[in-house]
Amino acid sequence: MSGVSVYQVRIKPLEPLMLRGPGEFDPSARGVSAAAVSQAFLAPSTVAGLLVSLLLRRPVEPVSDWMCYVDRMLELLNKLGIRWIRGPYLAQGSTPYVPIRAGGDLFFIDLHQLAYHFKRELANIEKGDLEGFMSRLRQIQDRAEPRLQERVGIALTAREGLKAVREGFLYTASYVSVRCDYIAVEIGSDSGAAPGSLARLNGAAAAVGGEGRVARLEVLGVDGGVAELVAGSEFEGGYAVLLSPLVLRSPMRIERKGGRVSVKVGDKCFLELISGTVGLRGLGFSIAERSRKPVYPAILEGSIVKLCEGQRYTRDVGPYANVPGGALLELLGRIGYGSLAALG
Protein backbone atom coordinates (compact mmCIF):
# COMPACT_ATOMS: atom_id res chain seq x y z
CA MET A 1 0.00 0.00 0.00
CA SER A 2 1.54 3.27 -1.17
CA GLY A 3 2.76 5.66 1.51
CA VAL A 4 2.25 3.19 4.35
CA SER A 5 4.90 1.65 6.58
CA VAL A 6 3.87 -1.64 8.18
CA TYR A 7 4.89 -2.53 11.75
CA GLN A 8 4.37 -5.41 14.12
CA VAL A 9 3.84 -4.20 17.68
CA ARG A 10 4.54 -6.85 20.31
CA ILE A 11 2.90 -6.51 23.72
CA LYS A 12 4.77 -8.45 26.40
CA PRO A 13 2.76 -8.57 29.68
CA LEU A 14 4.95 -8.46 32.79
CA GLU A 15 2.10 -9.52 35.12
CA PRO A 16 -1.38 -11.08 34.84
CA LEU A 17 -3.92 -8.86 33.07
CA MET A 18 -7.44 -7.75 33.97
CA LEU A 19 -9.40 -7.53 30.71
CA ARG A 20 -12.85 -6.74 32.01
CA GLY A 21 -16.04 -7.95 30.41
CA PRO A 22 -19.45 -6.30 30.88
CA GLY A 23 -20.77 -5.53 34.37
CA GLU A 24 -19.69 -3.42 37.32
CA PHE A 25 -17.11 -4.34 39.93
CA ASP A 26 -17.69 -2.64 43.26
CA PRO A 27 -18.32 -4.46 46.56
CA SER A 28 -20.58 -1.63 47.72
CA ALA A 29 -22.74 -1.87 44.58
CA ARG A 30 -23.80 -5.50 44.99
CA GLY A 31 -22.97 -6.31 48.56
CA VAL A 32 -20.60 -9.02 49.65
CA SER A 33 -18.59 -11.25 47.32
CA ALA A 34 -18.45 -8.98 44.29
CA ALA A 35 -16.46 -10.56 41.47
CA ALA A 36 -14.41 -9.39 38.50
CA VAL A 37 -13.53 -11.93 35.82
CA SER A 38 -11.08 -11.15 33.07
CA GLN A 39 -11.86 -12.06 29.49
CA ALA A 40 -9.41 -14.50 27.92
CA PHE A 41 -7.97 -12.17 25.30
CA LEU A 42 -7.28 -8.54 24.45
CA ALA A 43 -10.00 -6.63 22.61
CA PRO A 44 -9.04 -4.45 19.62
CA SER A 45 -10.43 -1.41 21.43
CA THR A 46 -8.01 -2.05 24.34
CA VAL A 47 -5.04 -2.22 21.96
CA ALA A 48 -6.14 0.90 20.06
CA GLY A 49 -6.66 2.85 23.29
CA LEU A 50 -3.25 1.76 24.57
CA LEU A 51 -1.44 2.90 21.41
CA VAL A 52 -3.32 6.19 21.02
CA SER A 53 -2.78 7.14 24.68
CA LEU A 54 0.96 6.48 24.39
CA LEU A 55 1.34 8.41 21.13
CA LEU A 56 -0.63 11.49 22.20
CA ARG A 57 1.45 14.32 23.60
CA ARG A 58 -1.30 15.53 25.92
CA PRO A 59 -4.70 14.29 27.18
CA VAL A 60 -7.86 14.98 25.19
CA GLU A 61 -11.08 16.41 26.55
CA PRO A 62 -13.72 13.77 27.37
CA VAL A 63 -16.95 13.62 25.36
CA SER A 64 -20.27 12.28 26.59
CA ASP A 65 -21.92 11.27 23.30
CA TRP A 66 -20.94 7.89 21.80
CA MET A 67 -20.94 9.00 18.15
CA CYS A 68 -18.89 12.08 19.08
CA TYR A 69 -16.40 9.66 20.61
CA VAL A 70 -16.34 7.64 17.36
CA ASP A 71 -15.65 10.78 15.29
CA ARG A 72 -12.92 11.89 17.68
CA MET A 73 -11.19 8.49 17.59
CA LEU A 74 -11.12 8.61 13.78
CA GLU A 75 -9.63 12.11 13.96
CA LEU A 76 -6.96 10.90 16.40
CA LEU A 77 -6.06 7.92 14.21
CA ASN A 78 -5.66 10.26 11.23
CA LYS A 79 -3.65 12.75 13.26
CA LEU A 80 -1.29 10.03 14.50
CA GLY A 81 -0.95 8.52 11.03
CA ILE A 82 -2.48 5.15 11.99
CA ARG A 83 -4.19 3.84 8.85
CA TRP A 84 -5.15 0.45 10.26
CA ILE A 85 -4.59 -2.07 13.06
CA ARG A 86 -5.02 -5.82 12.48
CA GLY A 87 -5.06 -8.53 15.14
CA PRO A 88 -4.36 -9.33 17.92
CA TYR A 89 -2.90 -12.85 18.09
CA LEU A 90 -0.42 -14.73 20.29
CA ALA A 91 3.09 -15.75 19.25
CA GLN A 92 5.89 -18.00 20.42
CA GLY A 93 9.08 -16.83 18.75
CA SER A 94 8.02 -16.13 15.16
CA THR A 95 5.16 -18.70 15.23
CA PRO A 96 1.65 -17.16 15.32
CA TYR A 97 -1.06 -18.76 17.47
CA VAL A 98 -4.69 -17.96 16.76
CA PRO A 99 -7.88 -18.52 18.78
CA ILE A 100 -10.26 -21.39 17.99
CA ARG A 101 -13.69 -22.05 19.48
CA ALA A 102 -14.85 -25.62 20.01
CA GLY A 103 -18.16 -25.81 21.82
CA GLY A 104 -17.83 -23.55 24.83
CA ASP A 105 -14.02 -23.71 24.88
CA LEU A 106 -11.54 -21.18 23.53
CA PHE A 107 -7.99 -22.36 22.91
CA PHE A 108 -5.05 -21.38 20.70
CA ILE A 109 -3.50 -23.21 17.74
CA ASP A 110 -0.37 -22.74 15.65
CA LEU A 111 -1.79 -20.98 12.55
CA HIS A 112 0.25 -23.09 10.14
CA GLN A 113 -0.95 -26.33 11.79
CA LEU A 114 -4.53 -25.04 11.74
CA ALA A 115 -4.35 -24.27 8.01
CA TYR A 116 -2.76 -27.66 7.28
CA HIS A 117 -5.42 -29.70 9.10
CA PHE A 118 -8.22 -27.49 7.77
CA LYS A 119 -7.19 -28.26 4.19
CA ARG A 120 -6.92 -31.99 4.97
CA GLU A 121 -10.45 -32.05 6.40
CA LEU A 122 -11.99 -29.55 3.97
CA ALA A 123 -14.13 -32.12 2.12
CA ASN A 124 -15.77 -33.22 5.39
CA ILE A 125 -16.04 -29.64 6.68
CA GLU A 126 -17.93 -28.55 3.55
CA LYS A 127 -20.42 -31.36 4.24
CA GLY A 128 -20.96 -29.99 7.75
CA ASP A 129 -18.92 -32.72 9.47
CA LEU A 130 -16.54 -30.92 11.86
CA GLU A 131 -16.03 -33.71 14.40
CA GLY A 132 -12.77 -35.07 12.98
CA PHE A 133 -11.32 -31.61 12.44
CA MET A 134 -12.10 -30.38 15.96
CA SER A 135 -10.89 -33.63 17.53
CA ARG A 136 -7.54 -33.22 15.80
CA LEU A 137 -7.25 -29.58 16.91
CA ARG A 138 -7.81 -30.55 20.54
CA GLN A 139 -4.94 -33.01 20.26
CA ILE A 140 -2.49 -30.38 19.01
CA GLN A 141 -3.65 -27.35 21.01
CA ASP A 142 -0.67 -25.58 22.51
CA ARG A 143 0.11 -24.38 25.98
CA ALA A 144 0.51 -20.87 24.54
CA GLU A 145 -2.88 -19.82 25.83
CA PRO A 146 -4.40 -17.57 28.50
CA ARG A 147 -4.91 -19.05 31.99
CA LEU A 148 -7.11 -17.54 34.69
CA GLN A 149 -5.62 -16.79 38.14
CA GLU A 150 -8.14 -16.16 40.92
CA ARG A 151 -7.35 -13.84 43.82
CA VAL A 152 -9.46 -12.98 46.86
CA GLY A 153 -9.43 -9.64 48.67
CA ILE A 154 -11.46 -7.36 50.91
CA ALA A 155 -12.61 -3.78 50.46
CA LEU A 156 -10.71 -1.05 52.32
CA THR A 157 -11.73 2.34 53.67
CA ALA A 158 -9.46 5.33 54.25
CA ARG A 159 -9.79 7.26 57.51
CA GLU A 160 -7.43 10.08 58.43
CA GLY A 161 -4.83 8.79 55.99
CA LEU A 162 -5.03 5.21 57.30
CA LYS A 163 -6.56 2.27 55.50
CA ALA A 164 -8.91 -0.06 57.36
CA VAL A 165 -10.75 -3.24 56.41
CA ARG A 166 -14.39 -2.79 55.43
CA GLU A 167 -15.94 -5.69 57.29
CA GLY A 168 -17.96 -8.16 55.23
CA PHE A 169 -17.00 -6.79 51.81
CA LEU A 170 -15.06 -9.60 50.14
CA TYR A 171 -14.29 -9.71 46.44
CA THR A 172 -12.72 -12.14 44.00
CA ALA A 173 -10.75 -11.13 40.93
CA SER A 174 -9.79 -13.55 38.16
CA TYR A 175 -6.81 -12.28 36.18
CA VAL A 176 -5.58 -13.75 32.91
CA SER A 177 -2.00 -14.90 32.51
CA VAL A 178 -0.89 -14.95 28.87
CA ARG A 179 1.35 -17.97 28.38
CA CYS A 180 3.25 -16.90 25.27
CA ASP A 181 6.21 -14.76 24.26
CA TYR A 182 4.05 -11.82 23.23
CA ILE A 183 0.71 -10.58 21.92
CA ALA A 184 1.03 -9.10 18.43
CA VAL A 185 -0.84 -6.59 16.29
CA GLU A 186 0.03 -5.38 12.80
CA ILE A 187 -0.21 -1.67 12.09
CA GLY A 188 -0.17 0.40 8.91
CA SER A 189 1.29 3.83 9.63
CA ASP A 190 1.12 6.77 7.23
CA SER A 191 4.73 7.44 6.27
CA GLY A 192 4.10 11.16 5.91
CA ALA A 193 2.43 11.80 9.28
CA ALA A 194 4.31 11.84 12.58
CA PRO A 195 7.37 10.04 11.16
CA GLY A 196 8.82 7.45 13.50
CA SER A 197 5.98 7.84 16.01
CA LEU A 198 5.37 4.10 16.32
CA ALA A 199 9.08 3.32 16.32
CA ARG A 200 9.59 5.47 19.41
CA LEU A 201 7.32 3.11 21.36
CA ASN A 202 9.96 0.39 21.08
CA GLY A 203 10.92 -0.61 24.63
CA ALA A 204 8.19 1.54 26.20
CA ALA A 205 6.20 0.43 29.25
CA ALA A 206 2.43 0.44 28.87
CA ALA A 207 -0.60 0.11 31.14
CA VAL A 208 -2.87 -2.59 29.70
CA GLY A 209 -6.55 -3.07 30.51
CA GLY A 210 -8.16 -2.72 33.93
CA GLU A 211 -5.99 -1.78 36.92
CA GLY A 212 -3.25 -0.64 34.51
CA ARG A 213 -1.33 -3.92 34.48
CA VAL A 214 2.20 -3.44 33.11
CA ALA A 215 3.50 -4.63 29.75
CA ARG A 216 6.53 -3.82 27.61
CA LEU A 217 6.25 -2.96 23.92
CA GLU A 218 8.50 -3.99 21.06
CA VAL A 219 8.10 -2.49 17.57
CA LEU A 220 9.40 -4.24 14.43
CA GLY A 221 9.25 -3.11 10.82
CA VAL A 222 7.48 -5.63 8.60
CA ASP A 223 8.55 -4.07 5.30
CA GLY A 224 12.07 -5.40 5.76
CA GLY A 225 10.83 -8.95 6.29
CA VAL A 226 11.48 -8.84 10.05
CA ALA A 227 8.02 -10.17 10.87
CA GLU A 228 5.39 -12.19 9.01
CA LEU A 229 2.02 -10.65 8.15
CA VAL A 230 -0.75 -12.74 9.68
CA ALA A 231 -3.80 -10.47 9.68
CA GLY A 232 -2.64 -7.70 7.33
CA SER A 233 -2.57 -9.80 4.15
CA GLU A 234 -5.37 -8.98 1.72
CA PHE A 235 -7.49 -11.65 0.00
CA GLU A 236 -10.85 -12.22 -1.66
CA GLY A 237 -13.31 -14.97 -0.72
CA GLY A 238 -12.27 -18.20 0.98
CA TYR A 239 -11.95 -19.53 4.52
CA ALA A 240 -10.43 -17.69 7.48
CA VAL A 241 -10.33 -17.66 11.27
CA LEU A 242 -11.48 -14.62 13.24
CA LEU A 243 -8.76 -13.16 15.47
CA SER A 244 -11.15 -10.60 16.94
CA PRO A 245 -14.94 -10.25 17.11
CA LEU A 246 -16.78 -9.28 13.93
CA VAL A 247 -19.30 -6.77 15.24
CA LEU A 248 -22.64 -7.02 13.43
CA ARG A 249 -24.34 -3.73 12.63
CA SER A 250 -26.96 -2.63 10.12
CA PRO A 251 -27.05 -3.29 7.16
CA MET A 252 -25.60 -6.70 8.16
CA ARG A 253 -28.19 -9.30 9.17
CA ILE A 254 -28.00 -12.94 10.29
CA GLU A 255 -29.88 -15.61 8.36
CA ARG A 256 -30.29 -19.23 9.51
CA LYS A 257 -31.17 -21.78 6.85
CA GLY A 258 -30.80 -25.57 6.86
CA GLY A 259 -28.65 -25.56 9.99
CA ARG A 260 -26.24 -23.01 8.51
CA VAL A 261 -25.70 -19.45 9.72
CA SER A 262 -24.81 -16.75 7.23
CA VAL A 263 -24.51 -12.98 7.31
CA LYS A 264 -26.03 -10.97 4.48
CA VAL A 265 -25.66 -7.37 3.37
CA GLY A 266 -28.85 -6.57 1.52
CA ASP A 267 -29.48 -9.54 -0.79
CA LYS A 268 -25.80 -10.46 -1.05
CA CYS A 269 -24.09 -13.18 0.96
CA PHE A 270 -21.35 -11.58 3.05
CA LEU A 271 -19.98 -14.61 4.90
CA GLU A 272 -20.93 -18.03 6.26
CA LEU A 273 -20.24 -19.21 9.80
CA ILE A 274 -18.47 -22.59 9.53
CA SER A 275 -17.79 -23.08 13.25
CA GLY A 276 -17.89 -20.84 16.29
CA THR A 277 -20.34 -18.66 18.14
CA VAL A 278 -22.53 -15.59 17.74
CA GLY A 279 -22.69 -13.64 21.00
CA LEU A 280 -22.34 -10.19 22.53
CA ARG A 281 -19.19 -8.10 22.82
CA GLY A 282 -18.70 -4.77 24.54
CA LEU A 283 -16.37 -2.25 22.94
CA GLY A 284 -14.44 -1.69 26.14
CA PHE A 285 -14.18 1.01 28.79
CA SER A 286 -13.29 4.65 28.15
CA ILE A 287 -10.88 5.84 30.84
CA ALA A 288 -11.23 9.50 29.78
CA GLU A 289 -15.05 9.38 29.98
CA ARG A 290 -15.07 6.85 32.85
CA SER A 291 -17.87 4.93 31.17
CA ARG A 292 -18.46 1.68 29.33
CA LYS A 293 -18.82 1.66 25.57
CA PRO A 294 -21.84 0.01 23.89
CA VAL A 295 -22.43 -3.73 23.56
CA TYR A 296 -23.19 -5.22 20.13
CA PRO A 297 -23.93 -8.67 18.68
CA ALA A 298 -20.84 -10.21 17.10
CA ILE A 299 -19.36 -13.36 15.62
CA LEU A 300 -16.80 -14.12 18.31
CA GLU A 301 -13.05 -14.49 17.98
CA GLY A 302 -11.97 -18.06 17.25
CA SER A 303 -14.85 -18.68 14.84
CA ILE A 304 -14.08 -20.01 11.35
CA VAL A 305 -15.90 -18.21 8.55
CA LYS A 306 -16.08 -18.33 4.77
CA LEU A 307 -16.10 -15.04 2.90
CA CYS A 308 -18.58 -15.40 0.08
CA GLU A 309 -17.51 -15.09 -3.54
CA GLY A 310 -16.51 -11.54 -4.44
CA GLN A 311 -16.23 -10.41 -0.80
CA ARG A 312 -12.90 -8.75 0.02
CA TYR A 313 -10.68 -8.57 3.09
CA THR A 314 -8.54 -5.43 3.02
CA ARG A 315 -5.87 -4.03 5.28
CA ASP A 316 -7.60 -0.75 5.98
CA VAL A 317 -10.99 -1.94 7.31
CA GLY A 318 -10.79 -5.75 7.07
CA PRO A 319 -14.09 -7.41 6.05
CA TYR A 320 -15.99 -4.15 6.57
CA ALA A 321 -14.76 -3.17 3.07
CA ASN A 322 -17.87 -5.03 1.83
CA VAL A 323 -20.35 -3.23 4.09
CA PRO A 324 -21.70 0.25 3.33
CA GLY A 325 -21.83 2.16 6.58
CA GLY A 326 -20.86 5.26 8.46
CA ALA A 327 -18.17 6.29 10.88
CA LEU A 328 -18.77 3.47 13.38
CA LEU A 329 -18.07 0.65 10.92
CA GLU A 330 -15.03 2.53 9.62
CA LEU A 331 -13.66 2.86 13.16
CA LEU A 332 -14.36 -0.79 14.04
CA GLY A 333 -12.56 -1.95 10.92
CA ARG A 334 -9.59 0.37 11.29
CA ILE A 335 -8.83 -0.59 14.91
CA GLY A 336 -8.98 -4.32 14.20
CA TYR A 337 -12.48 -5.68 14.76
CA GLY A 338 -13.14 -8.49 12.30
CA SER A 339 -9.44 -9.26 11.80
CA LEU A 340 -8.98 -12.48 9.83
CA ALA A 341 -6.16 -14.92 9.17
CA ALA A 342 -6.65 -16.79 5.89
CA LEU A 343 -6.82 -20.59 5.93
CA GLY A 344 -6.43 -20.95 2.15
Q: What are these language model-derived features?
A:
Residues S2-G344:
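Conserved active-site/ligand-binding neighborhood in enzyme cores
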